[in-house]
């Protein structure tokens, strides 16, 4: 027998159907309740009590704590729908109407504590038409709108990994057809999958949505002609944001084609291996190149640094412009110090502009914008008389309309602004003629109350009589219970307390009506003025965003100059040659982790006409991996326009960096350690060019010695002799046989990590010198790792037998085993 649903639960089911796969928070009075499976999820993830009523599981959170709890849910990858109840101001009986007015997902955040300050927060839509893939992504918090198109899944996955969205959107058929793509993305990214109706991804629906959003009749002006899959993804994404999530899209910038400007390409594996954004072991930045380079003072500058780190420049002009600016500020220590202080006062102009454009801004946000814009004018004043490098020329010439806005915000607003419009006290008295008049009436009400209280005390003879105010009662007169009979008959009883009585009078009631009327008028006026001010600011949004870009650029180069000053970095010569020459180079991360002066610098000299490949041998723990990573990191920093930790450097522009470092099973894809190694190496062989930099560490370890050696040598020969694939390569290996290639190929040079011996014990020098290593010292490393001494001793015996005339050691007699 099924229970008949109550009207309220019928209402909940209707909302739940609309919410789809979102967790539904259903407003009931002063709480948001969850039912059935949602209640269980809520209780488990928020550590709140799970109860039940009539066998229906339920849990709830106070309405006053909603935002904090929602942030916790979204941070764990949940999508949340909020069903609000309509105002019941008229006190009508019956069921209060409830509708979903908000859906919150990880990728579609306009304003939230979850938004990373110095990184983008993208929601990305993906679509397939034939063999072509189109993608579109949005950062709603700043209005960035990107589209792209790819003809293979490899480039598609690499692009998505670089963008690192927190939410992926497509339709059911795409997810079913591209399970392998989704699995690869989930392996690299922490991403929430969202599904949307397939018709939104059709060309007619998508173009209609784009036309409506940008008020155009053609997309050719955006450069999107012919990009059908990308257009389909873009239109569907707009529909999802506006029609499904009920969020505004009017603030979005016009769609730009992602990847049009050529960059130094660093695939996801290399980003991970080189620890650009985070160390391999741990999700936080500590120990990453980003953590070392992060000296920015603004959110915009921080986002620019992060994006440039994984997308360094390929255009020599872009690199040189930034190098010139870094050099300028490196020589201007006093100016740099002043600018750092002023930049630290500039808040997130992009996200503030978005909040104002989408009617989410509070008065305090307007105050933050005002203070940030004022700081920008101070920055402009300090740069005014400087002979700025070309990169910054004219960027801080603040347009007259923006100057007028800044003046308005500076002179017409009260200094300390409230969090809510309803609190009032936003505008200066002179901003509107009615403001001062209404405020005077409100202010005079306080003195009227005091005068009225004193008058009726004298009239009644009750000296302890008080005139008070309470939210529920309004203004009232309070006297002790035993004195209440002394009051005149015109005093009207309002409330009885334990030891007091509360009254009102016709005069007090009339005063209250007038005061409340004034407060209502004042709140209505300030609300109207606040909306008008926001519209005025929105009219200047493009100018604010242009200034925001200038601030980001300035912050970027000033922070790099600060970094160079702190660690005595030098300017590398970057050009179109094929040189890779570094004198006294150092690993930028290791340099910060060691005591000053203890890191051993090393030289590197490579040139396509001479040394194209370095074969690096030496024992583990001697610094081989640090050295080869170091070269890649210095190239990346140089092509960011940064100075680098080296005495000098000459770097010909690199188009791609590939790394094959370390080993690890990929269980989710059913791939062994060796298979992962081979797949990543295959990617390098297919995609490297003559201008690429390839870092290979221990290729061929996961199979038999001869198999591994054969593969390693074949890879070396391919990169040495195949036209179009002659990349500069640093190859760290334990295969001594490979070092013989130096005798047969002029483009190969042997280097090794130097080790000295003292009484048979190795001393690692961490110097990279010419020639190949004679010993690997693996047993010594095993001893340092804590091997039992008996195992270490036996390994030494076996090693001596290997090195002797009999190359096959006999098992110890006491330990001999019958082998099959």
From Swiss-Prot:
Q: Which GO terms describe its cellular component?
A: cytosol
Provide any one GO MF term from the record: mismatched DNA binding
Q: Which InterPro entries match?
A: DNA_mismatch_repair_MutS (IPR005748), DNA_mismatch_repair_MutS-lik_N (IPR007695), DNA_mismatch_repair_MutS/MSH (IPR017261), DNA_mismatch_repair_MutS_C (IPR000432), DNA_mismatch_repair_MutS_clamp (IPR007861), DNA_mismatch_repair_MutS_core (IPR007696), DNA_mismatch_repair_MutS_N (IPR016151), DNA_mismatch_repair_MutS_sf (IPR036187)
Task: Give the transmembrane ranges.
Answer: none
Q: Which domain of life is it from?
A: Bacteria
User: Where ATP is bound, by residue?
Assistant: 618-625
Q: Its Gene Ontology biological processes?
A: mismatch repair
Record's keyword terms, sorted: ATP-binding, DNA damage, DNA repair, DNA-binding, Nucleotide-binding
The protein's matches in Pfam families, at most eight in alphabetical order, are given as: MutS_I, MutS_II, MutS_III, MutS_IV, MutS_V
Q: What family is this?
A: Belongs to the DNA mismatch repair MutS family.
UniProt-listed PANTHER family: DNA MISMATCH REPAIR PROTEIN MSH1, MITOCHONDRIAL, DNA MISMATCH REPAIR PROTEIN MUTS FAMILY MEMBER
Q: What does this protein do?
A: This protein is involved in the repair of mismatches in DNA. It is possible that it carries out the mismatch recognition step. This protein has a weak ATPase activity.
* UniProt name for this protein: DNA mismatch repair protein MutS
Q: What is the lineage of its organism?
A: Bacteria, Pseudomonadati, Chlamydiota, Chlamydiia, Chlamydiales
